[in-house]
Amino acid sequence: GGNSNVCIGDEAGRSLTTGDNNIAIGHEALYSENAHGQNIAIGYRALKAQDGGAEVQNTAIGYLAGQAIDLGRENVLVGGNAGDALTHADYNVAIGNGSLGADTLGHKSTAVGYATLNAQNFTSSTDSNNTAVGYFAGVAVTTGVNNTLIGSLAGDALTEGGNNTALGIRSLGADTLGSRNTAIGYNTLLVQNFASATNSYNVAMGHDAGRAITTGIFNTLIGSLAGDALSDADTNVAIGASALTTDTLGSKSTAVGHSALEAQNFASATTTHNTAVGADSGKAISTGTTNSTFGSSSGAALTTGTHNVLIGSYAGAGGVGNLTTGLRNILIGHGAGQNNGNDNGNIAIGYETNCQGHAEAIVLGGNVDSVANTTFTFGRNDGSDRVHNNYTSNATFTRVSDERYKKEIQNNTDCGLDFINELRTVTFKFKAKSEIPNTLPDYDASKTTADHTGKLYGMIAQEVKAAMATHNITDFGGHSEEESSGIQGVAQSMFIYPLIKAVQELSAQVTALTARVTELEG
């Protein structure tokens, strides 16, 4: 025994007897070891106290590096005073002057940089699983575990906080007792600090993301300046550069996209329930709440409006009457409601549909405007392709019938009394889906009861079609037939015009008969 050892310096490797393959360079380096090998001790009193009970394979380079280790194994300690208090500690890496300088019984720590994990100290055998890389990274950690701190001053105030990840200069730089945080980027979660042990679950990624959070919890902030003004605010999500960048005390906001909810700011603790998804979505909202905006620049002009739903790029924005303070509007489609102004309770669905100057209106179609308050309008474009009704009065639909939109105007001569007399009105009940022919798309053998079981009044579409053929009537909107299934239908309102013609014909007959009776009685 005692082979292949290199010992250079006063008292270096003094106690070695049977240990092999050791290197001891420096005054009292590897002083106490006698029987074990594969150790490297370079520096004044490096590994001086080691006398392990197995092949310990420690490496200590630097003044007093690992000087107190006795039974610890597989440690790598490089730098003046690196790991100089460790005793029964295993699997540690300390590189840098003063790194891991106070711990005695902690295991599995990695400290790289000047004074990293300098205050860590476990009084009983503990797997710390702490990693600190960078000048003063984790310098104040005492008994916190499972921390990963990378960057100068990263997590430099942490003491007992655990399960944190801080990557970037000064990231998580003030917190002492917070746990389960993730801070990635320069100044992320810079001033967060909990006075008592707290699982805050904050995530901040990006330059200055979440830099002003103090005691807020459950926030997810990803992107440069994302949520960078939030302080005591909770359960926010901001993803995108400058998303939710102004707010301080608003909670339960979701901003996804560049500058989404950029201007939102509440001076007192407020549950906002705002959701903005898309670049510049909801970017002007200041104190409006419970808004949902989806699409690039959707709701981009909205400020104090509440309870609005906007879906589609430039929905409620991009026009001459942007939605700013309106309430309870639903705008769906590119540019839908972009001229809505500050009106309330409107529903606009379709490309550039609008309710400008109106309230409680419903618009459906493309590039079509409402005609008045409390109306339902549908169609495409304005003019002859637009149909509307006023559902607070007669609830009937109105379509443009202006003579200026019409040509080839002729008297109706074929769709009158004779046609009406050909029709049969009936009473009936609808069949269950299992009773109709199985060739029809609605057939369902399991549906043995009709959706509506009461008696109804109406006509038979096939009979209407036959009457039309008898009187050579074409292009009559009162009858329709689906091309794919052959299912026929009747539009009851279209029979008003044949009925008017029939009444006129009857009136003429009555007039003639009255004249005849008068003549006969005279």
Model-based region annotation:
Residues 418, 462, 466, 497-501:
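Feature representing long, continuous alpha-helical segments
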Residues 433-442, 461-462:
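Glycine- and aromatic-enriched periplasmic loops at the membrane-periplasm interface
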Residues 1-401:
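Glycine- and small/polar-enriched repetitive beta-structure motifs of secreted/surface proteins
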Residues 470, 474-522:
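C-terminal intramolecular chaperone/auto-processing assembly modules
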Residues 422-425, 461-474:
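Glycine-rich, acidic and aromatic/proline-enriched surface loops and short helix-turn segments
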Residues 439-451:
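Short, surface-exposed loop/helix-turn segments at secondary-structure junctions
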Residues 401-429, 437, 500-522:
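Extracellular receptor-binding modules and their adjoining Ser/Thr/Gly/Asp/Asn-rich linkers
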Residues 448-453, 487-491:
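Short, contiguous acidic/charged loop-to-helix segments that flank catalytic cores in large enzymes
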